[in-house]
């Protein structure tokens, strides 16, 4: 079984540190991590990208197990997201398809080729940006220092404020970074030693201060996979290849550690046009080479229909009020 990080024992440790109640079950044919979610209407269990199994029959056994667990804790429903490719038809019979919580489509880069081959698989634009990183005064650092989270939060707030969104709080991100599987990458700008003398090379674009962090991201490592998680860059300096510097460093560092694949963690669905909110960063992620991966999505197994309807109504009301 290939275990996603969100169904691992390490992820349960993160949940414990976040003061969440969770339940871990593992045997020879399936594995799951179920997180107890509390609402004013009642509780439910959430299995992010779980349960995990290699066959539909094993998925069925895992669902029976988690159903008993849910009943024991008086849950209204169970929210599951199995990654098994051929289980969607089965899930349609026993569960309700709901809005996806975890990304249903992602982009996977195979890290087993040599670095030269990986670079050759970049698009021309990304390859040019990669080679220009040192010339543009960009340097990438890694840290486990929780003080570094302030940079990620500051950069995320720029984006979230513009889009009227709410990001993760500081404690959540610091708790993530405290886990052994997490590393924070920072891209800093340093003024180049020489300034362009040719008028054509000079620019009126805004320039960061020396030593300023202009991009940051958390990366998680589990088994043979590195995951690209919370990330942000300073939108004032878009013409600097900060995100290319960030990702290429993370990709090649992972390869040197012996990690086999890089999960970009979410892209727009196949065929999405420019109106899709993920269109831009999907095109960017694909520019590093790789291949798509599609999952079944999020399903609710309803145990208490009346309370489940109340749960849905309460969500609709909350959305309306906000």
What are these regions (language model features)?
Residues 40-44, 79, 86-89, 270-272:
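Short catalytic/ligand-binding loop motif for oxyanion handling, primarily in non-cytosolic enzymes
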Residues 1-41, 84-87, 93-102, 108-109, ...:
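A conserved beta-strand-loop-helix scaffold within acyl/acetyltransferase catalytic domains
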Residues 4, 14-17, 21-22, 38-39, ...:
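Active-site/acyl-donor-binding loops of N-acyltransferases
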Residues 42-54, 75-77:
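Glycine-/proline-rich flexible loop or hinge segments
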Residues 57-105:
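Non-catalytic accessory segments adjacent to catalytic cores
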Residues 62-66, 181-195, 199-304:
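Aromatic (often tryptophan-rich) hydrophobic motifs at membrane interfaces
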């Amino acid at each position: 079984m290939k275990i996603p990080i969100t169904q691992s024992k390490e992820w349960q440790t993160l949940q414990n540190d976040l003061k969440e109640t969770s339940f871990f079950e593992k045997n020879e044919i399936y594995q799951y991590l179920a997180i107890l979610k509390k609402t004013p209407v009642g509780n439910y269990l959430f299995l992010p990208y779980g349960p995990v199994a290699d066959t539909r029959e094993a998925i069925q056994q895992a669902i029976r197990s988690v159903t008993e667990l849910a009943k024991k804790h008086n849950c209204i429903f169970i929210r599951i997201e199995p990654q098994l490719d051929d289980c969607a038809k089965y899930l349609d019979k026993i569960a309700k398809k709901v809005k996806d919580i975890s990304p249903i489509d992602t982009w996977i880069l195979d890290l087993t080729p040599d670095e030269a081959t990986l670079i050759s698989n970049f698009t021309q634009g990304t390859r040019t940006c990669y080679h220009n990183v040192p010339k543009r005064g960009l340097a990438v650092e890694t840290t486990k220092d929780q003080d570094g989270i302030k940079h990620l939060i500051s950069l995320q707030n720029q984006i979230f404020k513009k889009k009227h969104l709410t990001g993760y709080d500081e404690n959540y991100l610091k708790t993530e970074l405290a886990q052994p599987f997490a590393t924070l990458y920072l891209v800093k700008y340093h003024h180049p030693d020489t300034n362009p003398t040719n008028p054509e090379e000079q620019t009126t674009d805004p320039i960061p201060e020396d030593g300023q962090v202009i991009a940051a991201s958390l990366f998680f490592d589990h088994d043979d996979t590195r995951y690209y998680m919370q990330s942000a860059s300073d939108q004032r300096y878009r013409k600097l290849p900060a995100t290319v510097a960030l990702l290429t460093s993370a990709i090649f560092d992972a390869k040197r550690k012996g990690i086999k694949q890089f999960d970009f963690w979410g892209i727009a669905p196949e065929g999405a046009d420019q109106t899709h909110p993920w269109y831009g960063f999907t095109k960017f992620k694909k520019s590093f080479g790789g291949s798509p991966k599609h999952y079944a999505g999020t399903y609710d197994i309803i145990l208490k229909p009346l309370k489940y309807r109340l749960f849905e109504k309460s969500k609709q009301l909350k959305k309306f009020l906000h």
